[in-house]
From Swiss-Prot:
Signal peptide from the UniProt entry: none
Chief localisation class: membrane
A cellular-component GO term for this protein: nucleoplasm
Protein name: Gliolectin
Transmembrane segments: 121-137
Glycosites: 149, 156, 198-199, 205, 218
Organism: Drosophila melanogaster
């Protein structure tokens, strides 16, 4: 079911910027703010007069001159800034800027961080780079070069299709890794026990064979009777 149409009021007009206040309004505003005559319209002058009257009132009532104290503070700040500049001139090579320029040599002697740098933007040519590399290689001893070659060969070699410093293969390949044997019974003890067992078993076998031979050769067999 459709809703009934809503009754909309008249549309509001577009906002128009407020016109500047008239001269009479300015006078009324000034009169309300500063309680002055309608003819005075200079705001800056009115503010200066108000500050002057308030300063005189404070000086008469409390004996404290605001303007004089502010001038003293300004002079003290100026003197402190001058002392700071003089102190900075004595201590060369400081991080803070000073009024006097410092030569680069003096700054380098006082401040280890201040290093006189060469003009930037200079690029080396390929010939210069190769020449400097040759000089470095000539200065290196033979042992250092051998070590570097060995490290390069080690870095280039592969194992299981990977670098030697890479992760070891997992899964089936990881099952075939050589494991440490568990230390069990020592070998000499095992050998002695095995030999003792063999000796005892051989002695038992020999005794049994001797007994059997005696039983066979005692002359009671039927074959011996038939021969007789």
């Amino acid at each position: 079911m459709l809703c009934p149409p809503m009754a909309l009021g008249p549309f509001l007009a577009a906002p128009v910027p407020r016109p500047p206040p008239s001269a009479s309004e300015k006078k009324r505003i000034c009169r309300n703010l500063f309680n002055n005559a309608p003819g005075d319209s200079n705001i800056d002058q009115l503010l200066a007069q108000e500050q002057h009257t308030q300063r005189l009132y404070v000086k008469e009532r409390y004996g404290y001159d605001i303007q004089l104290e502010s001038n003293r503070d300004a002079d003290a700040n100026t003197d402190a800034d001058a002392d700071t500049d003089a102190h900075c001139q004595v201590l060369r090579g400081m991080r803070y800027p000073t009024s006097r320029t410092i030569s680069s040599t003096d700054a380098d002697e006082c401040n280890p961080k201040a290093v006189s740098q060469a003009p930037r933007g200079m690029a080396l040519t390929p010939a210069q780079i190769s020449a400097s590399a040759k000089l470095i290689l000539q200065k290196c001893p033979e042992s250092d070069r051998k070590k570097s070659n060995g490290s390069a060969d080690l870095a280039n070699c592969t194992r299981h299709g990977q670098k030697p410093y890479a992760r070891q293969p997992q899964g089936l390949k990881g099952m075939y890794n050589v494991r440490k044997t568990v230390n069990g019974i020592s070998k000499p003890n095992v050998k002695n026990g095995y030999n003792n067992n063999n000796n005892s078993s051989s002695s038992n076998n020999n005794s049994n064979m001797n007994i059997n031979n005696k039983i066979v050769d005692n002359g009671t067999s039927e074959l011996a009777d038939q021969k007789q």
